[in-house]
């Protein structure tokens, strides 16, 4: 996403397929965007988890923090939020959409992998994953009113506490 409006017809042309084929595959522009964002998010968080190495709560925190910082600095995502705010929030934060459920599942898989390696948490992995994703959504996308939008440092502190680490 280079900061331009996403044109499904142009994407279909670039892929050498008919617009009708794109429509059959994804039905709507919103679903196409959701699939792209979800796939990128799943891949990126897995890559970052692998990159930080280590095990346990600190490894999870470092992976989540790296992911959050990338999102906070993603120009294409910022452009989408600025130009199509309602659509972007619906895509990114709706439990009925594509992105949020898949990101919760991706975070849950990371937590469960750490649990198999000995990490213990007071919360069930699905609940912890949901809380981590929803907090990131609030801090990164839609809490400018509370003055926390883009504040990845405070987000890290809260995620640390959820993971059982000292938030300081």
Regions found by a protein language model. Give the residues of each.
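Amphipathic alpha-helical packing segments from all-alpha helical-bundle domains
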Residues: 89-117, 126-133
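Hydrophobic/aromatic-rich alpha-helical bundle segments in the mid-to-C-terminal region
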Residues: 115-160
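Helical hydrophobic small-molecule/effector-binding pocket
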Residues: 61-83, 97-98, 108, 146
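Hydrophobic alpha-helical connector segments
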Residues: 35, 48-77, 128-132
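Short, hydrophobic secondary-structure boundary micro-motifs
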Residues: 78-83, 89-91, 119-123, 148
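Generic hydrophobic, amphipathic alpha-helix propensity
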Residues: 11, 36-40, 44-48, 107
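Short, flexible helix-adjacent loops and helix caps
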Residues: 3-4, 49, 53, 76, ...
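Helix-turn-helix
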Residues: 2-31, 35
């Amino acid at each position: 996403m280079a900061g331009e409006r996403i044109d499904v017809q142009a994407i279909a042309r670039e892929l050498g397929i008919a617009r009708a084929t794109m429509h059959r595959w994804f039905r709507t522009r919103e679903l196409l965007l959701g699939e792209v964002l979800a796939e990128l998010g799943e891949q990126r968080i897995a890559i970052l988890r692998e990159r930080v190495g280590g095990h346990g709560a600190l490894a999870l925190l470092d992976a989540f923090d790296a992911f959050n910082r990338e999102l906070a600095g993603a120009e294409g995502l910022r452009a989408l939020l600025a130009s199509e705010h309602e659509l972007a929030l619906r895509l990114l934060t709706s439990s009925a959409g594509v992105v949020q459920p898949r990101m919760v599942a991706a975070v849950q898989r990371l937590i469960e992998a750490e649990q198999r390696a000995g990490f213990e948490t007071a919360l069930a992995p699905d609940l912890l994953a949901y809380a981590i994703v929803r907090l990131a959504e609030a801090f990164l996308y839609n809490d400018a009113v509370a003055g926390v939008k883009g504040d990845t440092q405070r987000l890290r502190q809260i995620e640390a506490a959820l993971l059982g680490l000292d938030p300081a």
